[in-house]
Amino acid sequence: MIFLLPSIISVMLLAEPVLMLGDTEDADLMEMVQLSRPFFNPIIRAVELVELREERQRDCGHLHDPCPNDRPGHRTCCIGLQCRYGKCLVRVGR
């Protein structure tokens, strides 16, 4: 069995028609991709969580952004800011 880095595997999968791999090499490559899938699943989930967190950060208002309260359930200002005078301003100490 051939041992390749994941990036090389993806390049080889994309270039498969050009390389014209034989049936055995193709089957070995596909088997290796299937066997490596459980290893990469946690990495894929972690990347998805990071993307979700970045999406949530974009959904909030940054400093001096307007913060309309007409969207119920939507966090209008980012963490550390509060909505005052219709804009997201620095949170005043408690």
UniProtKB/Swiss-Prot annotation:
Coiled coil: none annotated. It is found in: Secreted. This is U1-theraphotoxin-Sp1a. Probable ion channel inhibitor. Shows insecticidal activity. Acts synergistically with the neonicotinoid insecticide imidacloprid. Is neither a repellent that repels insects nor an attractant that is preferentially consumed by insects. Is very stable. Residues 1-22 form the signal peptide. The presence of a 'disulfide through disulfide knot' structurally defines this protein as a knottin. One of its GO terms (cellular component) is extracellular region. The keyword Lipid biosynthesis does not apply.
